[in-house]
């Protein structure tokens, strides 16, 4: 499991949420594996309450952690139906955002997108799948923000966690990758 440092001003709950979520997406916390909130809170150096709150939030918003009262918790298996729903949502929204972006983008936005694609190509050649996914997510965020749809982007990110695990799995296994500009 990878543990990032806590951000300045980041609440304990937000920190726990971010670290758990990132480790689930990267598959460092494997689908079907048990999750021990007491051990996790010890490892990241915060009390158990914010960890439990983060687990409840993840369980409710994306069904990514299964909570069994009096028994324990486990990382949910990848739900194919939720993957398909997230794919469908992205297909519809990203098409609409791309059309809006064509009308709303200024030269600085286009340059920022070009720079992002260059970095994606660099990290693809370097064999850094985690960084590649981060940059891809950032490219989509840039598009949503320039269209003034950041709330929509954030909503999609919360719903797409099962889809993101499939993306993480595929980017780590596919050998011949190219980015089309």
Where are these regions (language model features)?
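Hydrophobic faces of stable alpha-helices that mediate helix-helix packing
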Residues: 87-95, 110-114, 177-181
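Short, surface-exposed, polar/charged, turn-prone segments marking secondary-structure boundaries
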Residues: 93-96, 102-104, 161, 172-174, ...
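Conserved amphipathic alpha-helical segments that form helical-bundle/coiled-coil interaction surfaces
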Residues: 107-168, 180-181
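C-terminal-biased regions
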Residues: 5, 57, 168-181
């Amino acid at each position: 499991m990878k543990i990032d440092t806590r951000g300045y001003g980041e609440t304990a709950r937000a920190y726990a949420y971010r670290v758990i979520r990132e480790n689930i997406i990267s598959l460092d916390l494997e689908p079907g594996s048990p999750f021990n909130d007491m051990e996790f809170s010890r490892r990241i150096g915060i009390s158990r309450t914010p960890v439990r709150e983060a687990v409840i939030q993840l369980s409710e918003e994306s069904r990514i952690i299964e909570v069994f009262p009096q028994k324990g918790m486990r990382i949910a298996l990848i739900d194919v139906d939720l993957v398909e729903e997230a794919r469908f949502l992205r297909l519809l929204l990203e098409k609409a955002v791309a059309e809006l972006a064509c009308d709303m983008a200024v030269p600085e936005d286009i340059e920022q997108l070009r720079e992002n694609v260059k970095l994606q190509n660099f990290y693809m050649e370097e064999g850094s799948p985690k960084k590649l996914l981060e940059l891809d997510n950032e490219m989509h965020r840039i598009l949503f923000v320039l269209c003034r749809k950041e709330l929509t982007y954030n909503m999609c990110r919360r719903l797409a966690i099962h889809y993101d695990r499939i993306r993480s799995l595929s980017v780590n296994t596919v050998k011949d990758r190219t980015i089309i500009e």
